[in-house]
Amino acid sequence: MPILKNDWAPLLEEEFQKPYYLKLREFLKEEYRTRTIYPDMHDIFNALHYTPYANVKVVLLGQDPYHGPGQAHGLSFSVKPGVPVPPSLANIFKELHDDLGCYIPDNGYLVKWAEQGVLLLNTVLTVRRGQANSHRGKGWEYFTDRVIELVNEKDDPVVFLLWGRNAQEKKERITNPRHLIIEAPHPSPFSAARGFFGHRPFSRTNAFLTKHGREPIDWQIENIGARAE
């Protein structure tokens, strides 16, 4: 059964056959069998499932998935409904409020962004419970580098949001002058005050998309408390 069912599939078909990926797959089989790994194995590629290649307008790079129970579901920075909003995402929502006036929602479920063309991509797609960066250096970086290179090849202008050193290391792969790179410190409480707050990435992204004839992103994540009744 194919891993991907949309237009990413033919683009990444070769990648899934490369020796590094086959080795990564064997490593993951053993990890999922013997440990608690996040996200659920069916959610690993959700960034690509929710945002087909043709639809990508924005790339928001994260590091590795959240490593607490029930948080990660395959989209960078996003958490499932009913899970408390983590500190970095709370700071993203604060900046969004200050930038565009969006109200701060009661959840951190970012599928609405993904469905509009925001590729919510972590550079490493799996993690052991409670152990940040535990799957770093196992092969995911090669895979996500390829995803970034493919987006870089697009003719349509794309905005790359690179927050923090880890994401900014990928800048060398973004060589197409059509695209816009917006860099800032990571939204983590440890660094947000050093220039993440006030850098207005959401309005800048929408201004760039509009200027190039692309539909802007509706960044407002709605409350789900009322809808859950």
Curated annotation (Swiss-Prot):
GO biological processes: base-excision repair, AP site formation via deaminated base removal
Record-linked Pfam families: UDG (PF03167)
Compartment list: Cytoplasm
NCBIfam families registered for this protein in UniProt: PRK05254.1-1, PRK05254.1-2, PRK05254.1-4, PRK05254.1-5, ung
MF annotations from Gene Ontology: uracil DNA N-glycosylase activity
CDD domains, sorted: UDG-F1-like
Family per similarity comment: Belongs to the uracil-DNA glycosylase (UDG) superfamily. UNG family.
Primary localization: cytoplasm
Signal sequence, renumbered to the chain: none
UniProt-listed Enzyme Commission number(s): 3.2.2.27
Function: Excises uracil residues from the DNA which can arise as a result of misincorporation of dUMP residues by DNA polymerase or due to deamination of cytosine.
Catalytic activity annotation: Hydrolyzes single-stranded DNA or mismatched double-stranded DNA and polynucleotides, releasing free uracil
Positions of the catalytic residues: 64 (proton acceptor)
Name recorded for this polypeptide: Uracil-DNA glycosylase
Enzyme class: hydrolase
UniProt KW keywords: Cytoplasm, DNA damage, DNA repair, Hydrolase
Coiled coil: none
HAMAP family: UDG (MF_00148)
GO cellular component, one term: cytoplasm
